[in-house]
């Protein structure tokens, strides 16, 4: 009887929903997992999962320069794993880096998870050092996605694509094959 009781308690503990923390780097995920313990699952996105396709412009110029995003080739498995974990979780904590790229990564992942499991709360957390105190403080004070940072990253990405896709072919034709043009590659 005592053994059955222990097994039941163990099963109840294992069935408790955990909080999913998503970071960009697998090394960070491993370290953070040690600090947060058994109530959390920490996964890595391995950086961007969503971007513009490489094979075409993918900027809808007639619709306010709206980008046409896709899941990056080879990243669907990671995205599906994150969505699967999110469905089983109590909440999702998006902990990508605190910069434009990180905010964009968090925004894209949040949208994909929200589409797959709308009932799971999704929060954005930010920390600037990987310590137990910094992580706990970030978890206690979640914030919304900074849409201004997301829009800044989107604008940069759209400009890069427009400049590169339109000017690079001209360079190949007029100067030399293999040259490329970009927002930060050319003299201002």
Identify the role of each PLM range.
Residues 176-188:
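Extended, Lys/Arg-enriched charged tracts that mediate electrostatic binding to polyanionic substrates
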Residues 1-157, 163-166, 171, 186-187:
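Intrinsically disordered, low-complexity regulatory segments
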């Amino acid at each position: 009887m005592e053994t059955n009781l222990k097994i039941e308690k163990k099963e109840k503990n294992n069935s408790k929903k955990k909080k999913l923390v998503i970071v960009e780097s697998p090394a960070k995920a491993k370290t953070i997992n040690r600090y947060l313990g058994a109530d959390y699952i920490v996964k890595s996105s391995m950086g961007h999962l969503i971007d513009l396709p490489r094979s075409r412009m993918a900027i809808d110029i007639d619709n306010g320069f709206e980008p046409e995003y896709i899941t990056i080739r080879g990243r669907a498995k990671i995205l599906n794993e994150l969505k699967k974990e999110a469905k089983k979780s109590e909440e999702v904590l998006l902990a990508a880096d605190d910069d434009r790229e990180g905010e964009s990564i968090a925004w894209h992942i949040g949208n994909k998870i929200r589409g797959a499991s709308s009932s799971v709360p999704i929060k954005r957390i930010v920390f600037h050092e990987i310590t137990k105190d910094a992580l706990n403080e970030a978890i206690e004070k979640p914030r919304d996605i900074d849409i201004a940072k997301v829009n800044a990253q989107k604008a940069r990405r759209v400009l890069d694509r427009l400049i590169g896709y339109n000017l690079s072919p001209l360079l190949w034709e007029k100067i030399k094959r293999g040259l490329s043009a970009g927002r930060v590659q050319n003299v201002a």
